[in-house]
């Protein structure tokens, strides 16, 4: 059962969204709740503590919504890459952008800070 405070926090953050699913987890001994919402045909995942404090928001965005510094850094590091998906992840004061892309025939996940600084790259095992 998802606490009322969690659902209220999600509704306040995304008033026009529809809750799709919710799950409970524990990290470092602390319980949390993940709520997936659908917002204008895109998904977002909101992670809250049991009191309804939002810990992080991970939402799908379009490439055009990326900050110019990030879009420029991607074009420079991965010229002619096919972008398969973009997520904006906000955790406290930090915002990073997680991109699923195909570059030189390889499926990759690349993460950039909001200022365009490259963070890391890993193989994308998703089909």
Predicted regions, residues:
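Interaction-mediating elements
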Residues: 1-127
